[in-house]
């Protein structure tokens, strides 16, 4: 809908998730501001009905000018991003032109610093993989393991930076697509070097869902290293899959044709959950740790986890529970019919592949 107010010489593009950008070449400031107002109004007029209720959509829009606010394209996007957050602070359905005296400014400049560090890490081989096992509840035998990415911290020699610090920035800037491909390539090489090792699961970002060449890259990499496709498991989050349902269905379909297994990660945190299971034909669902951490103490979570296990069993899917940290939770998951478990009770992430139980 917002794209309908854009003229032919203007570029309307999706940045990812629910974020879009419009590039206006050779316009005056007042023209950009008029367009911003039109976009905000157009979004507000979109009819949207969910579960029998009429909902009102809102948009926050930020405006930045070149060269007034930035020296290059990356900085221009960053300044427009700051202005968008300034608009959010002002209320719903509004827009703002970038101003330098904002707390959001400092936040975004920090994001730019992280983006530079991510670029440096990709260019200088400063990413590392750790592995954590995923085990059968019965007998605690390893079924497969998950690859977890870390970044070398050059400011603190010997230390690694956890993904929570850099992945959100990488998702925002799009560099996460390169990280995803690095992880896939490195995992396939590890699998090739250890023919008897267990399958490895890799996480795919929401950004990579829209990459139409990703499945071919996976197929080519597996073929190049002569690794059977069923040794690679691809995980994508429920929230990302539902937000980009068409792309998720396409990716799951092509991965299944290749022979890779697919896992729907962080299940239960999205707004759809059960309703979309039939549309997203993943082999496995991984229940979000939010529902598992205090499972033995939370009766509501127990009902939810049991229901997931029952529905998954009926659909022929495997269920994984993450963040399993005590015996009481493990026994409860066993009673609920959960197939596989992951967590510190069984092992901790390690550079060793395959990881060792209790390691």
List where the protein language model places each region.
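A short pre-motif secondary-structure segment
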Residues: 4-5, 10-14, 55
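Cyclic nucleotide signaling catalytic output domains
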Residues: 12, 23, 38-42, 49, ...
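EAL-family c-di-GMP phosphodiesterase catalytic domain
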Residues: 23-26, 53, 67, 137, ...
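Short beta-strand edge/capping elements of PAS-family sensory modules
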Residues: 74-75, 93, 143-146, 179, ...
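Bacterial c-di-GMP phosphodiesterase EAL domain
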Residues: 103-104, 110-227, 237-240, 253-254, ...
């Amino acid at each position: 809908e917002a794209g309908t107010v854009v003229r032919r010489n203007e570029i309307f593009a999706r940045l990812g998730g629910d974020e879009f950008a419009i590039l206006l070449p050779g316009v005056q400031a007042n023209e950009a501001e008029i367009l911003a107002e039109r976009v905000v109004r157009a979004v507000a007029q979109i009819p949207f009905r969910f579960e029998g209720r009429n909902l009102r959509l809102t948009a926050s829009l930020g405006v930045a000018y070149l060269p007034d606010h930035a020296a290059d394209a990356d900085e221009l996007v960053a300044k427009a991003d700051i202005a968008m957050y300034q608009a959010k602070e002002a209320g719903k359905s509004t827009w703002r032109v970038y101003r330098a005296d904002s707390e959001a400014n400092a936040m975004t400049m920090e994001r730019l610093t992280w983006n530079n560090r991510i670029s440096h890490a990709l260019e200088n081989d400063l990413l590392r993989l750790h592995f954590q096992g995923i085990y059968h509840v019965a007998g605690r035998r390893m079924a497969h393991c998950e690859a977890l990415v870390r970044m070398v911290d050059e400011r603190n020699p010997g230390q690694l930076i956890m993904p929570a610090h850099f992945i959100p920035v990488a998702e925002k800037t799009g560099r996460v697509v390169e990280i995803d491909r690095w992880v896939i390539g490195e995992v396939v090489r590890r699998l090739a070097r250890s023919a008897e090792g267990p399958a490895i699961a890799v996480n795919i970002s929401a950004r990579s869902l829209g990459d139409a060449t990703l499945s071919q890259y996976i197929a080519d990499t597996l073929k190049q290293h002569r690794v059977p496709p069923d040794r690679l498991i691809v995980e994508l989050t429920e929230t990302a899959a539902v937000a980009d349902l068409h792309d998720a269905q396409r990716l799951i379909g092509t991965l299944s044709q290749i022979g890779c297994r697919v896992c729907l990660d962080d299940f239960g945190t999205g707004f759809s959950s059960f309703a979309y299971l039939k549309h997203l034909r993943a082999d496995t669902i991984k229940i979000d740790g939010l529902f598992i951490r205090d499972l033995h103490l939370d009766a509501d979570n127990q009902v939810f986890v049991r229901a997931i296990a029952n529905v998954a069993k009926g659909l022929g899917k495997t269920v994984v529970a993450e963040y399993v940290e005590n015996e009481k939770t493990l026994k409860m998951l066993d009673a609920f019919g959960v197939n596989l478990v992951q967590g510190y009770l069984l092992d901790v992430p390690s550079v060793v592949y395959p990881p060792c139980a209790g390691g």
